[in-house]
Amino acid sequence: TYGEHILNDELLRSDMLKKLLMYMLTHREHPASIQELSEALWQEDEVDNPAGALKNLMYRLRTIMKKYISDDKFIITSQGSYAWNNEIEVELDAERFEDYCKKAKASKDEAVILQNYESAVALYKGEFMENSLDHHWAVTLSTYYHSMFLNAVKTLADLYIRLERYHDIEDLSVHALRMDRVDEELHCYHIMALIKGNKYDLAMKRYDEAVKILQDALGVHNPAKLQKVQQELLKMNKGTAPEALENIHDDMVEDEESVGVYFCGYPIFKEIYRLEVRKNSRLGE
């Protein structure tokens, strides 16, 4: 949006125009050379005249923005490069999300942490540029924001556990699982919240669903963290009081790493690799 004007997918139409605009917005801190933009848009595809193709694409983008938004010069040309006009302020939801997470992480005030992480989680609507994940720069940003989202969710869930806000854990985990259905810990949080809410039948159903999801998507059999949750379900079935949620969560961490080689097909390997990238990004590796 710009003032009262909206530039949506219908007006842009071309995927390449959308990618060009998003690249200019997300990299607006510096001028982008023709080579940088060409590599970002076409990667290793052979383009006869990348400078000419980029010039044509930029012309189309400027024409659309001028027609539907404003005569302002959003993108300027300088010495063989293109740059976003810094006089035009930009606010991206992704960057607002990042700011919330950073404020929460930097604070020691529980109320501030809760408020900012809750705002961040509410703002996150899914993978960043999910239709452009065939481009390395989009994948990098998407992985970065998604890892930040998972960290926000799990930190928030741990705070809710300490505050005994089990219904909030249930709502939070349901929302998070819509964004990432193959994260085992998210399934554990959800099932543990159902256990504390004495929703045994639903918890058992969700356990079975979670095991099947992880098996189908990743080829993982008998996931260790979910097995600990299953023990609590069995206790409930026998009429035994469930263990404290804090203890269940602590025990989800495996004592020993699995040893040996794991064989899987390429689709499973690709998904595991993607998850490892997310994990390493969270850990700053």
Regions found by a protein language model. Give the residues of each.
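Intrinsically disordered, low-complexity protein-interaction/activation regions
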Residues: 1-171
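An N-terminal, helix-rich hydrophobic module
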Residues: 105-128, 144-240
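Active-site-flanking beta-strand signature of metal-NTP-handling nucleotidyl enzymes
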Residues: 97, 250-251, 284-285
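Short regulatory alpha-helical coupling segments
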Residues: 264-284
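Amphipathic HAMP/coiled-coil signal-transducing linker helices
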Residues: 245-266
